[in-house]
């Protein structure tokens, strides 16, 4: 009996795959245990779509012993092309590391993604750890000549523009080096900017950043910031109000109104980043006298009620913050935390008392939580069919944790973490409910894949087939299921 395998969702080694070269310069292989379309595409430097098309596949499920044609394996042509490229100029070689993307590598070596793909003969954006990429050298005579003309143009134009800009920008910009656990949201709050401003200032096309990346930031003493502050101070007398809509988050609202998330928190005396549909927020004006008096009273109280809390299994900063009626940011600052990942047994200093009146607000909390879950699931389903992209966090392509990051930020503000990172920050539950997160051990031990539970054994996730709805009772998922976690 043939054993079926779910495509693209395992990373065990391909052992003994049979390869036969045909006269037409195509290759055929026989599927072995552990093979998947994604893995074969990576091994033979093609794409899942090309494999599916070449073999007229109507499903991504493979059978052991099945014969597949590998498209476009023109070894002689590729070798001659590479040798000619080497002759034209000496190429540097870069080895892909875990977490890399073409965009990151192109930025690091001051290239465009298109140049990188041309230089390496790539037909897709998929790369794998350990893969060797050429990162310098001549792509073609036409591209090199265009580069020369562009460089001549850019050198003159950039020198003009930079000289014009330097007088105003040099004094008004600083730099920030990205640290482990950082996100654009966290950095924007740290340097009192909006995420949109950070992205424009650094020409970022996505929210993905990497450790040791240097970002330009606005100096607090710049002319622009003083202008903004003066205009804001003029506006404070007329308070603007905003009613929260489905899909909103503090980050989204802050960007729309050119504010920081922290400013909205302060003005509205928010204890958490959780919003609910219909909630009215003030968007201009000073933090209310009530909030300042309450903050002063809480600081007075906290000075006498500082407690040490030991992290338990299932805890997250958000869960602990709710328990002690403080914000996650207050816990971060109090404990100098560089990341939101907590360890069981870790000691945290908390200023405040565990809330005794949680039951009175439970009905409001339940209704707002339900609304957020519905919004999140709607946002997730709207992405059905979006292709898989390693490290992707946008509708142009997602990986599993990038998909979770995207949909969670439709209803709250979270950092970009791995599947294991989200596992460590959420509360464990014995059985998943709608809106909970289900985790699986796929290509390595521990949580390496995550999806959102929809009920009736189904969950939505981004796997190698793209964003799809899968069934947990499928033999592949059933044997790899780790457990469920709750965020809301």
UniProtKB/Swiss-Prot annotation:
Protein localization: Secreted, Cell wall
Induction line: Expressed in the vegetative growth phase under exclusive control of sigma-D (SigD). Expression of lytF is heterogeneous in the exponentially growing cell population; it is ON in single cells and OFF in long chains. The same subpopulation of cells that express lytF also express flagellin.
CDD domains, alphabetized: LysM
Modes of activity regulation: Is inhibited in vitro by para-hydroxymercuribenzoate, a sulfydryl inhibitor.
Residue ranges of domain LysM in the record: 27-70, 92-135, 174-217, 240-283, 307-350
Single GO MF descriptor: cysteine-type peptidase activity
Highest taxon above the source species: Bacteria
UniProt keyword annotation of ATP-binding present: no
SUPFAM superfamilies for the chain: Cysteine proteinases, LysM domain
UniProt GO BP: cell wall organization; proteolysis
Name of this chain's protein: Peptidoglycan endopeptidase LytF
Originating organism: Bacillus subtilis (strain 168)
UniProt gene name: lytF
């Amino acid at each position: 009996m043939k054993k079926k395998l779910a495509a693209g969702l395992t990373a065990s080694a391909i052992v003994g795959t049979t390869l036969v070269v045909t006269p037409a310069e195509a290759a055929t292989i026989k599927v072995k245990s552990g093979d998947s379309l994604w893995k074969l595409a990576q091994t033979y430097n093609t794409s899942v779509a090309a494999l599916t098309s070449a073999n007229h596949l109507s499903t991504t499920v493979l059978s052991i012993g099945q014969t597949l044609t590998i498209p476009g394996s023109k070894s002689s042509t590729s070798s001659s092309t590479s040798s000619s490229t080497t002759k034209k100029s000496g190429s540097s070689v870069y080895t892909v590391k875990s977490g890399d993307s073409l965009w990151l590598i192109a930025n690091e070596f001051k290239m465009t993604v298109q140049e990188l793909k041309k230089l390496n003969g790539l037909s897709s954006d998929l790369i794998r750890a350990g893969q060797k990429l050429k990162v310098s050298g001549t792509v073609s005579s036409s591209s090199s000549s265009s580069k020369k003309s562009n460089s001549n143009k850019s050198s003159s134009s950039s020198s003009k523009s930079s000289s014009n800009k330097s007088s105003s920008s040099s004094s008004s910009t600083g730099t920030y080096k990205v640290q482990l656990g950082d996100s654009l949201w966290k950095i924007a709050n740290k340097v009192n900017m909006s995420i949109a401003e950070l992205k424009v200032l650094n020409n970022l096309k996505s929210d993905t950043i990497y450790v040791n990346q240097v970002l330009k930031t606005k100096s607090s003493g710049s002319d622009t910031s003083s202008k903004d502050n003066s205009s804001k101070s003029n506006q404070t007398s007329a308070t603007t109000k905003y009613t929260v809509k489905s899909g909103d988050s503090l980050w989204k609202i802050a960007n729309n109104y050119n504010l920081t998330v922290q400013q909205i928190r302060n003005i509205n005396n928010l204890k958490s980043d959780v919003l609910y549909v219909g909630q009215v927020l003030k968007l201009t004006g000073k933090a209310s006298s009530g909030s300042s008096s309450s903050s002063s009273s809480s600081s007075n109280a906290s000075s006498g009620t500082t407690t040490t809390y030991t992290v338990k299994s299932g805890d997250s900063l958000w869960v602990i913050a709710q328990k002690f009626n403080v914000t996650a940011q207050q816990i971060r600052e109090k404990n100098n935390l560089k990341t939101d990942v907590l360890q069981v047994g870790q000691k945290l200093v908390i200023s405040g008392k565990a809330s005794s009146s949680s039951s009175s607000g439970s009905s409001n909390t339940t209704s707002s939580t339900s609304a957020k879950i519905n919004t999140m699931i709607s946002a997730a389903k709207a992405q059905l069919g979006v292709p898989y992209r390693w490290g992707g966090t946008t509708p142009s392509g997602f990986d599993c944790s990038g998909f979770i990051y995207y949909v969670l930020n439709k209803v709250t503000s979270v950092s970009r973490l791995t599947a294991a990172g989200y596992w460590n920050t959420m509360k464990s539950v014995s059985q998943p409910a709608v809106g909970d997160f289900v985790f699986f051990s796929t290509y390595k031990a521990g949580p390496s894949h995550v999806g959102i539970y929809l009920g009736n054994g189904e969950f939505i996730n981004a796997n190698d087939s793209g964003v799809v709805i899968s069934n947990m009772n499928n033999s592949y998922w059933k044997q790899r299921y780790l457990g469920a976690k709750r965020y809301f």
